[in-house]
């Protein structure tokens, strides 16, 4: 009885929680517009491993740098060693070979520690004591000239960290963020992600590549579908293929590389790039043959464009709707005229307030430029002092104090400058000057007269229609009360 109960419990547990066993996961690094997947890792196998190329990381980050206005001081060179900084954790301790212990708690921002970065890229969080990272178990890496073998514990996947150089300067060379992802259910391709040059080549911007793919997909559907591109992940694949170029006889040694979730036939079109893969419609898979009749697309969805050109049937509108519409129109016109005149009376006041805001904004921008110029002088002196104390490890290490950096942001002032004038944001009238230099009682009398005139014109327009409908109402009611003719009882049936 005990064994049967144990077996029954195990069967129920595996049935209710199938995702905790045998569901492969991994950790994905994001830099710029590119992503790098680790080896399969999870709770059972918590060590996530990457083999990264430093030159590829540099190209990927140059497309989307973390700090657009970053002042670059140090440049990557092969003999330089690397430091790794997980963000917002305990202060690092050097452990030889150019490595830092994976813990940091400095109140200074290290994500973009130099001048030129904006406030949203360098958030100030203050000293943070948790979570605590251990260098050997949570994060470690080995550097071999231009390549890095990175090892990260799966529990720390979801954080961000930077790679710095053992060289003068403070700018991060690479800023990476991580996120836990699931391995797609389709079999992994035999070729690496970097070999799909028509999708992941870092030298070509993502936007131009996506536009070409959207144009090609629209041509294949004769512009009858809307294309929605999903660039969040490449876990599912779509294929665009030419059915006229399908291989006639299958190769017995060919293997299926991947099975796309969507295959779109496109014949008699000229793609913006050559076909790069071989798709077999009977197998519904990309094979290792060299027929070159298809191209792999990022995930997107096709939906038919709604037809809005259908004719509408006209129906007679009852008299009650005419009356309600007339009353509503009269009330709306009166309210609109009154509201426009009321807003126009405060136009001069808004203009004066807008001028005061403009003067204050100019003064703040001028003070910001002066502070930024002083900060640049201080940064220049800091570089020179670091070169003088280079043998002691830099200025901060020589004086045994924390290295702080000045982060000056002008985001709020720029947003204030880009906003339209206060008069355009508040007044939504007809653009006419209703002030006319009149007193308050004269403006109120003018408003009342315009309202009465609008109601009188509305009565002239709608009144004849209402009277005509009321005159014909008795005859319509009489015809409706006698739908059948009376029988003449004097006639012989």
Curated annotation (Swiss-Prot):
It comes from the Viruses. A lipid is attached at residue 465 (S-palmitoyl cysteine). The keyword Transmembrane applies. The keyword Ribosomal protein does not apply. One of its GO terms (cellular component) is virion membrane. Residues 23-446 are extracellular. Residues 316-336 are annotated as: Fusion peptide. Residues 344-390, 400-432 form a coiled coil. The surface protein (SU) attaches the virus to the host cell by binding to its receptor. This interaction triggers the refolding of the transmembrane protein (TM) and is thought to activate its fusogenic potential by unmasking its fusion peptide. Fusion occurs at the host cell plasma membrane. The lineage of its organism: Viruses, Riboviria, Pararnavirae, Artverviricota, Revtraviricetes. The gene is env. Disulfide bonds join 225-228, 225-404, 396-403. Residues 1-22 form the signal peptide. The record marks 315-316 as: Cleavage. InterPro entries: TLV/ENV_coat_polyprotein. The mature envelope protein (Env) consists of a trimer of SU-TM heterodimers attached by a labile interchain disulfide bond. A motif (CX6CC) lies at residues 396-404. CDD domains: HTLV-1-like_HR1-HR2 (cd09851). Specific enzymatic cleavages in vivo yield mature proteins. Envelope glycoproteins are synthesized as an inactive precursor that is N-glycosylated and processed likely by host cell furin or by a furin-like protease in the Golgi to yield the mature SU and TM proteins. The cleavage site between SU and TM requires the minimal sequence [KR]-X-[KR]-R. The CXXC motif is highly conserved across a broad range of retroviral envelope proteins. It is thought to participate in the formation of a labile disulfide bond possibly with the CX6CC motif present in the transmembrane protein. Isomerization of the intersubunit disulfide bond to an SU intrachain disulfide bond is thought to occur upon receptor recognition in order to allow membrane fusion. This is Envelope glycoprotein gp63. GO terms for biological process: fusion of virus membrane with host plasma membrane; symbiont entry into host cell; virion attachment to host cell. A motif (CXXC) lies at residues 225-228. Residues 468-493 are cytoplasmic.
